[in-house]
Design a protein with these regions (language model features):
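Hinge/lid segment of periplasmic solute-binding proteins
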Residues: 111-195, 271-274, 363, 373-374, ...
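Long, aromatic- and glycine/proline-rich binding clefts that accommodate carbohydrate-like moieties
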Residues: 363-367, 374-380, 388, 417, ...
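Extracytoplasmic/periplasmic substrate-binding proteins
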Residues: 64, 114, 251-262, 295-401
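Conserved N-terminal structural module of periplasmic/extracytoplasmic solute-binding proteins
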Residues: 1-122, 126-152, 497-595
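Short helix-initiation/N-cap motifs at beta->coil->alpha
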Residues: 83-93, 218-224, 314-328
């Protein structure tokens, strides 16, 4: 090739590169201009979330389209912009936007510190304690009709009950899941609820077991898994009884710890608050009751270990997506996951070649029966899902110039009709009274029957005790260590870790008091020097009572801790293991408190 031709080719490449650069630059400028135009308009609200699962964005898009059409009919041009952000980048994105003062109007709550709620979000109690106006408007429309269909009459009967209620009381859980005790406030309004179930391959069950019914007991879960494992080995095929990752293992741990140890949670709940807190957990350790050698705790760990023997090798390094991929490929008999994955799983299975597709069954994790030869003596019954609560919640940031419009959007989204519509498309479970889930989602409906609570080695949420327990738990479950090694390593390191966590709890209670007192004073001033109408005054009185409760708790927390330690010392166990633990703990605590 001649030199001139080479130079000509180089020039063309340079021109192409320059053209690409110009296009990208122009696109970036257009995006900035477009965003600035939107920000300058009073009728644009931006909504950010991390839900990238199949159907969720479509459900929100349909909701947005209907809301924009409604506002257009009312003579107002409104644009709602949906901004999905990958889960892994969500915290960084939201934090940057909030701190920089450029946050969207509404943000899905979660993945960021709770302190951000009080600093960057509007409290919503006053709005939530009043009726949702869309319900009253729809009821008035139906009442004006001289003739109503059967569906409309059913809807009218429902709305007669819901329309006068406070907005928060139209949620199945009363929106309790969105109450933030640290601020005694509500900051979020949710659209869905979620539960965890087991999915299974009916075709594979029929081939291996001769039937396609789910296991009815824990014993059958084990025997079915054994049969699938043996079938794979006999036919020299890669077949997993239970597709799993670290994520799924944690689900099993939570479920069966609850089923086997929830009675200990109630027993060690010294102040009868309804659950054992971190301080009470520590007191049980100092009494020699809460140890890795406690027979109930060990039984729960044995249950999880027995299930882990059916997980794939190296499951610790796998992600939730990896285990899901194995299941939809037909390479696993079962998988446990939440209702949020249901639509994605079903769609991916249907995308397989016809010969690889299979029918999916869904069942709840089977409970330990009272007749189980090893664990029946400890079986307390199934774990309740009463605390499933309302999720997929959005808060309104203090940076919005459209607060009322944001509230209106959330109210519109949480009518029975629209809540049904959004969740039908998303494949999730609705949360509003009267909203109807899809037929195949009824297996995911929260089951409130059962017990709550379990015992864990945790003194401070996310503290050093929990971190240490996690460090030794995973080698145990993956088969790298035996139980005695797990127990010894955990117990020997707990005194120092527990002392650090206890100090943080002890000092944290004192540091929180000033804010509580300020909040109490504000509510008290509103009540005493009010001049408000009766409804607002009643709201302020409720808030005053709520603010007093945590204040009294924080005022008495240190005295409670001191007295608990005194009682524990008076009734200290005398076995060598407990004596050594207590001595090490109090030495470490003395060091911590002196710093």
């Amino acid at each position: 090739m001649s030199k001139s031709k080479k130079e000509g080719g180089g020039k063309w490449i340079n021109m192409i590169g320059l053209a690409v650069l110009v296009v990208c630059y122009a696109g970036a400028i257009w995006n900035v201009v477009k965003a600035k135009r939107q920000e300058s308009r009073a009728d644009v609200i931006r909504v950010v979330h991390w839900q990238l699962e199949l159907g969720v964005r479509d459900g929100l898009a349909s909701l947005i389209e209907d809301f924009e059409a409604l506002k257009a009919e009312q003579g107002q041009s409104v644009e709602v912009v949906q901004i999905p952000i990958p889960e892994g980048a969500y915290n960084q994105y939201v934090t940057t936007q909030l701190i920089g003062g450029t946050a969207p109007d509404m943000i899905q709550i979660g993945k960021f510190p709770v302190e951000y709620l009080g600093r960057y979000f509007y409290p919503l109690s006053n709005k939530l304690q009043k009726p949702n106006p869309f319900l009253g408007e729809r009821l008035a429309e139906l009442n004006q009709k001289s003739e109503r269909s059967e569906v409309e009459e059913t809807q009218r009967t429902l709305l007669e009950t819901l329309a006068p209620k406070a907005w928060m009381d139209t949620f199945n859980d009363g929106l309790r899941g969105q109450f933030v005790p640290e601020f005694q406030e509500y900051f979020g309004v949710g659209f869905s609820t979620f539960t965890v179930r087991m999915y299974y391959n009916k075709n594979l069950f029929l081939k291996v077991l001769g039937h396609d019914r789910p296991p009815a007991s824990f014993e059958e879960l084990i025997s079915f898994s054994e049969a699938i494992k043996e079938y794979g080995e006999e036919h020299s095929i890669s077949l997993l009884p239970i597709a799993s990752s670290k994520y799924q293992a944690e689900v099993f741990r939570n479920r069966y710890l609850g089923e086997i140890t929830s009675d200990l949670d109630r027993l060690w709940d010294l102040d009868h608050s309804g659950e054992m807190d971190g301080v009470e957990s520590l007191m049980a350790m100092l009494r020699g009751e809460h140890t890795p050698w406690n027979p109930q705790y060990r039984a729960a760990m044995d249950v999880v270990q027995s299930l882990a023997s059916f997980f794939p090798r190296g499951f610790m390094s796998m992600g939730r997506e990896d285990s899901g991929f194995a299941f939809v490929q037909g390479k696993a008999g079962m998988i446990t996951s939440g209702s949020w994955d249901a639509l994605s799983y079903l769609k991916k299975i249907q995308d397989q070649p016809v010969e690889n597709r299979f029918e999916v069954g869904i069942f709840d994790l089977p409970s330990i029966s009272l007749t189980h030869p090893e664990y029946g003596i400890y079986a307390d019954g199934r774990l309740s899902e009463a605390s499933a609560g309302t999720g997929f919640a959005f808060g309104i940031t203090r940076f919005t110039s459209n607060f009322d419009l944001c509230v209106e959007f959330l109210q519109y989204a949480t009518t029975p009709e629209m809540n049904t519509h959004v969740n039908e498309i998303a494949g999730w479970i609705p949360v509003i009274t009267g909203a109807i889930p899809k037929e195949w989602l009824k297996n995911f409906q929260p089951n409130i029957v059962g017990y709550v609570g379990n015992i864990r080695f945790e003194v401070l949420g996310g503290g050093k005790v929990k971190l240490r327990e996690d460090q030794v738990f995973w080698p145990l479950i993956s088969g790298d260590t035996d139980y005695e090694t797990y127990a010894s390593e955990l117990w020997s390191s707990l005194p120092a870790e527990a002392a650090t966590d206890f100090k943080r709890l002890y000092e944290g209670s004192r540091e929180s008091i000033p804010n509580r007192q300020a909040r109490k004073s504000a509510y008290l001033a509103n009540v005493v020097f009010g001049g408000q109408d009766p409804q607002n005054r009643a709201v302020n009185e409720i808030q005053l009572q709520r603010s007093l409760q945590p204040l009294l708790l924080f005022k008495t927390t240190q005295k409670k801790m001191d007295r608990m330690l005194e009682l524990t010392l008076e009734d200290a166990p005398e076995d060598e293991r407990s004596v050594e633990f207590n001595q090490e703990f109090f030495k470490a605590l003395e060091r911590e408190m002196s710093q």
